[in-house]
């Protein structure tokens, strides 16, 4: 890969994510020009898993700091069968609790939240810290889009559910823990 191709691809993917999220994901809204960090972990996991599959790897899980690209399920050598990966979503109010489990053979999952890194996501519309959700998990075919949309849901909160009715997001699922009178609801 050349850096020019990577930059061009990332630029285009960021533009698509901005459009799909009504601007809630906007890497151009930061001072200094362009910050695609809400998309690149998922993009990197996709790229690495695609390289592995092209090299003949049938079963892989690529973890880019919690954003996962999953290919081919995992081989249970005891049972002699391929099973989907079981991926748990953590409760942001009690990190020892799993609140949802997804079974994924081929696809991606990304979670964005404030429970590990604190309030680090900026609402591009207001310039203030995003308070739309406590955590957002998106499951779908492409890690870059899961990553970007999970970031956008942190900005959009409950209003962001409408984005998942767009044809481009068919097959993508959202699971969010929202803020409500200082309590979490799912």
Regions found by a protein language model. Give the residues of each.
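Mature catalytic core of soluble alpha/beta enzymes
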Residues: 3-186
């Amino acid at each position: 890969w050349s850096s020019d191709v990577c930059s061009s691809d990332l630029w285009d993917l960021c533009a698509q994510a901005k459009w799909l999220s009504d601007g809630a994901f906007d890497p151009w809204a930061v001072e200094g020009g362009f910050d695609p960090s809400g998309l690149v972990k998922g993009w990197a996991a996709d790229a690495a898993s695609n390289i592995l599959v092209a090299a003949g790897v049938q079963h892989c899980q690529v973890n880019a700091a919690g954003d996962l690209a999953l290919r081919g399920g995992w081989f249970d050598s005891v049972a002699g069968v391929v099973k989907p990966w079981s991926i748990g979503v953590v409760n942001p109010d009690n990190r020892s609790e799993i609140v949802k489990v997804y079974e994924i053979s081929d696809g991606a999952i990304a979670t964005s939240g404030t429970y590990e890194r604190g309030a680090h996501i900026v609402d591009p519309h207001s310039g203030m810290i995003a308070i739309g959700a406590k955590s957002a998990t998106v499951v779908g075919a492409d890690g870059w889009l899961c990553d970007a949309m999970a970031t956008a849901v942190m900005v959009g909160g409950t209003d962001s559910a409408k984005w998942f009715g767009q044809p481009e997001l068919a097959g993508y699922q959202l699971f969010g823990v929202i803020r409500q009178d200082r309590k979490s609801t799912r």
